Amino acid sequence: MALPIIIDCDPGHDDAIALVLALASPELEVKAITSSAGNQTPEKTLRNVLRMLTLLKRPDIPVAGGAVKPLMRELIIADNVHGESGLDGPALPEPSFAPQSGTAVELMAKTLRESSQPVTIVSTGPQTNVALLLNSHPELHAKIARIVIMGGAMGLGNWTPAAEFNIYVDPEAAEIVFQSGIPVVMAGLDVTHKAQIHAADIERFRAIGNPISTIVAELLDFFMEYHKDEKWGFVGAPLHDPCTIAWLLKPEIFTTVERWVGVETQGKYTQGMTVVDYYFLTGNKPNATVMVDVDRQGFVDLLAERLQYYA
């Protein structure tokens, strides 16, 4: 039986590729997709969800737009990474259908309520929508199997020295998610920076030769440019968000540890930092499965294999 999931995302090149991977995978049943502000403004990320689903011919999936800003802060966007549209690079279709009239939280709640089994929430942007859902619907917590997030880092940040972008945008929301008592799986920079796509991998995807694999290659062409800055020391581009979907499909290609994680909301230098109790120093029980390593070749092979689904 396919695993029911809700995807909350802020497309974003890597979010878009996570959608491509999820919708090429019969092991997963994508029940709803909600958009958050983050990589771009809320209007643009919602439009990008609709553009991707139009491209993938999946207007049957309910879509709703989410919170327009973080719980307690002003919105920061990553247009320096993702461009003016949020998905700069390829020529994507205009949306062929409209989102639902309700909010992301309403769509998530309805989806959970109507599901006969617990649903996994995959969140690849800031945690604002998920936190709002948890706070407004305590009666639905039992219907959430787990929350798989792309965010945080045990080590170095990518937006500030201490903080990864998604968590930094809304640290209060992320703290609500981690302390919710619902199992959390964290794909942080420790693993996503190892899930790098190299130039040869992009050519491999392009050579698959179907319209979707070509678009993925073009998304990666653009995404590569930002990551060529030598300060990162990367060979390729880290494909952050697809790690969440890849873990659901093939957990064996990832190495994980069970640890307690808290989010710093106040620090002078460390706001948005995910504090991972690696050495069990706090006495707190683990609340998260933290990804720490990935078989890069296995990850690339999984993407290439699933891109052939669109032939």
Curated annotation (Swiss-Prot):
GO terms for molecular function: purine nucleosidase activity; uridine nucleosidase activity. Hydrolyzes cytidine or uridine to ribose and cytosine or uracil, respectively. Its EC number is 3.2.-.-. InterPro entries: I/U_nuclsd_hydro_CS (IPR015910), Inosine/uridine_hydrolase_dom (IPR001910), IUNH (IPR023186), Pyrim_hydro_RihA (IPR022975), Ribo_hydro-like (IPR036452). Belongs to the IUNH family. RihA subfamily. It comes from Salmonella agona (strain SL483). PANTHER family: INOSINE-URIDINE PREFERRING NUCLEOSIDE HYDROLASE, URIDINE NUCLEOSIDASE. GO terms for biological process: nucleobase-containing small molecule interconversion; purine nucleoside catabolic process; pyrimidine nucleobase metabolic process. Transmembrane segments: none annotated. Coiled coil: none annotated. The keyword Hydrolase applies. GO terms for cellular component: cytosol. It comes from the Bacteria. The lineage of its organism: Bacteria, Pseudomonadati, Pseudomonadota, Gammaproteobacteria, Enterobacterales. Keywords: Glycosidase, Hydrolase. The gene is rihA. The active site is at residue 240. This is Pyrimidine-specific ribonucleoside hydrolase RihA.
